[in-house]
């Protein structure tokens, strides 16, 4: 889907986060009008019906893993019943939106505050995979080009990244095989090239498809390895540098003005601020990441009193 390409669901900040299509119909259902909302409420559903929208794109999920039944006896069940009866689909973006490197919640905050050298505060692990494939020497370049064109081989600001090593490959087809090289039931040995590339896991299926299409073998030998590397762009929160150092008081006034909020809660630590970490929503889970990043200030939407007090005395 177009939404899935813009906000890959596998980039969600939590592996089991409730993102994607929560209420939907067949793939052939024509979506004519969409309504965007922060969360699904009675008013939002009523507005969707009134304006003729058959898709709601919501930030917050309506369905969570512990849902066991749909009845009018619960608020969630009543809302789901209305959506289904009125043929309204529901698509949730939640942390897939938060983690987006271009327009995620925290990235928008960082841009509004004028940060330079913006990076993810907590790069997300598990979003990268490594594809390894073995190809005849004469085809190695063709296979590489196909994989690059399909989206493999990107590492931060570099593309067409790969590693190759030559070796000796062996195989023997059974009686039903139709090998490109060699004869069934006869062991073959030939020079092959091992090709390795990193790929974002939501691109892996199309890279494999392009790789197999470019390969001459009847059965293509390849491996896909999960990586724990943090993604250089996708992550929770943002951290960046101010154009010039300023005192806590001056910076807080800027924050109030930029975000149009009448009040801020500040823990009273007065210091020169040059580097700032931000995370929309409840961000104390990433407080340690903010400290590790070297940030002088951490801005987030919700903090428990004891955590707020602890941060002032760390």
Predicted features by range, described:
Residues 1-314:
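Hydrophobic structural segments
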